[in-house]
């Protein structure tokens, strides 16, 4: 049974300030910029692009600075508040809304050039339905870049340890974290009719770039 929606909202509301502080960590900044570049290499501006589970907005803002029309959505009101504040302070034009991404998405059919879903899949109660909704929203030739915590138990990166510690601390709440590997994430994406362009494992996470 997946963890209830209120649980994730509670957790990420409480962690919003800590996630915003991570913005200044060189490792985090480099990862955000590299992720934004990866999508920018296959999606021409202005997109549009949706960042699902956008958190404090780092990826959405990185894409907006590259000339994309970006909408970031997240189930945590405080995370969205942090993202909006950062956009205003940095004078970056991006839209952020509070929305549960496990529900049907509020984007029209074939309306998006690109979708980011960075470290959100592990919390979605129905992963196949989530990917199917993304496919519905992508226009032909649009791209999805999705990442999830890596199942590789030998990894000891800070990110991998973060997710494993979270899973251990919240063990009384089932379904808090799901781990993936290249096979399971590729299969999940392909089963919903998307074509996998690239699948790779990075420290602590697995990522798939797919085309509609």
Walk through the language-model features, giving the residues of each.
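A short glycine-rich, Lys/Arg-flanked "PGG" loop and its adjoining helix->strand segment in the class I
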Residues: 128-140
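Short catalytic micro-motifs in class I SAM-dependent methyltransferases
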Residues: 119-123
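Class I SAM-dependent methyltransferase SAM/SAH-binding core
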Residues: 50, 56-103
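Short conserved loop adjoining the S-adenosyl-L-methionine
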Residues: 104-109
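A conserved beta-strand element that flanks and buttresses the S-adenosyl-L-methionine
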Residues: 116
């Amino acid at each position: 049974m997946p963890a209830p929606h209120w649980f994730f909202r509670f957790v990420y509301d409480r962690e919003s300030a800590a996630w915003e502080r991570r913005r200044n960590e060189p490792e985090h900044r480099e990862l955000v910029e590299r992720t934004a570049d990866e999508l920018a290499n296959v999606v021409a501006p202005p997109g549009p692009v949706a960042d699902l589970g956008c958190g404090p907005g780092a990826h959405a803002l990185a894409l907006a600075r590259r000339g994309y029309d970006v909408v970031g959505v997240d189930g945590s009101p405080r995370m969205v508040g942090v993202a909006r504040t950062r956009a205003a302070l940095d004078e970056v034009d991006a839209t952020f809304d509070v929305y549960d991404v496990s529900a049907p998405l509020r984007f029209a059919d074939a309306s998006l050039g690109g979708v980011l879903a960075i470290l959100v899949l592990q919390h979605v109660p129905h992963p196949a339905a989530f990917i199917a909704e993304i496919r519905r929203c992508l226009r032909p030739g649009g791209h999805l870049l999705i990442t999830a915590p890596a199942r590789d138990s030998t990894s000891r990166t800070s990110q991998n340890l973060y997710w494993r510690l979270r899973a251990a601390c919240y063990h009384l709440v089932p379904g808090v974290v799901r781990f993936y590997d290249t096979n399971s994430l590729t299969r999940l994406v392909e089963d919903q009719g998307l074509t996998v362009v690239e699948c790779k494992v990075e420290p602590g996470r697995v990522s798939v770039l797919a085309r509609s």
